[in-house]
Amino acid sequence: MMNGAKAIVKKYNEVSLILRIVVGLVIGAVLALAVPGAGWVGELGSLFVGALKGIAPVLVFVIVASALAQGSSKLDRRFGTVIWLYMLTTFLAAAIASITSFMFPVSVVLADAAQSDVVPQGLGEVLSTLLTNFVANHVSSLMSGNYIGILFWACMFGLAMKNIGSDTTKKFLADTADAVSQVVRWIINLAPFGIMGLVYTNVAGNGLAIFTQYGKLLALLVGTMLFMALIVSPFIIFLYLRCNPYPLVFRCLKESGLTAFFTRSSAANIPVNMALCEKLGLDKEMYSVSIPLGATINMDGAAITITIMTLAAANTLGIPVTLPAAVVLSAMSALGACGASGVAGGSLLLIPMACSLFGISNDVAMQMVGVGFIIGVIQDSVETALNSAGDVEFAATAEYHQWLKQGKPLPDFLK
């Protein structure tokens, strides 16, 4: 009996998560149409969202605190350009996502009737909420899912630990972060069952029309990412190198983005990016640091996902979002995106943090996370491809910009 169960689990894990989620989505829709009264199927979705709600605050705290505690302060000045490019493009990605959300507003059907806790009227109230949440009690922040407070106290704790913590203590903190990340991976591994339950609840209550709305949301996400990859990033590269940027852009998309599309992991794509940097003639001392750094802080796709999903939640609840408030959201999404690296479903799990700026409850935010998992088969692949290709593009741009300042010619493929 035990051997049979182990064989089933092994077979389940051998199938790719993408395929399992697609199967779960289809089964959920079919069951909703065939037996709409089977409430136990919908409970699987509730359990999945509940597990995410339970682990997400702890995950954000330990990941951020551990990253700051382990961080190195010995970063050479010549990396300033590449860090600036990584951060600039991540913010621009979030800002462009805000603009496209205003141009093409999208709302979605959520499983439960959703309302916001507080509807902010403008930038002043948003900033007031932000500042108040920053210094909220850290225990209550973890319990209530106040991600602004969680981030603030995690940063304080991590920086303090970096200065006074022993190596053993820092190792314990890193191991704790790894352990929590492992729990998240276990939960994500059960996503097909959760997705089946979420799709069942939505289709049983609203019919197949929900997929039209999800399609619009997915089109907005992918369209914004493509605009960033093919228009904005090349323009920034052109400003630095004063040459046609597309040979570099297309080479990075082909050799880095394509692989990342299928691995769905910037961290897993680091060896691919290292090899590409070598082909591009970059300084190994430079790219050996800038590529792993890019996999952590160059998160254009994640910033787009967080921003668009948050504004979709606001549209769904009828919350008016002013342009200045959207700028604050863009900055928060860009900063939050930098913490998405190496976390399963990282950008999706940071949606509640951004939603909290507009008084959107944790329950509603986690329903948006569930929607994100439904469309994540495509969204996450495109997001990772954009992130990973950008790592090499801007590492190369920073290096080639230095070449130009030194009077050294650009590589032949850029002339």
Regions found by a protein language model. Give the residues of each.
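Signature of multi-pass transmembrane helix bundles
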Residues: I8-A34, S46-L52, R77-L248, K408-K415
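Hydrophobic transmembrane alpha-helical segments of multi-pass transport and channel proteins
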Residues: A51, M87-F91, A95, V222-L226, ...
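Transmembrane helix boundary and interhelical junction motifs in multipass membrane proteins
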Residues: L59, G194, S265-N273, A303-M309, ...
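Membrane-interface alpha-helices at helix entry/exit sites of multi-pass transporters
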Residues: K74-V82, Q182-N189, K279-A295, L323-P324, ...
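Helix-loop-helix junctions within the multi-pass membrane cores of secondary transporters/permeases
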Residues: E255-A337, A395, K408-K415
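Transmembrane alpha-helical segments and their short flanking loops
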Residues: I308-K415
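Juxtamembrane helix-boundary/capping and inter-helix hinge elements in multi-pass membrane proteins
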Residues: L68-R77, N163-D167, N206, R242-P245, ...
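Membrane-water interface of transmembrane alpha-helices in multipass transporters/channels
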Residues: W40-V41, D76, L208-K216, P245-R251, ...
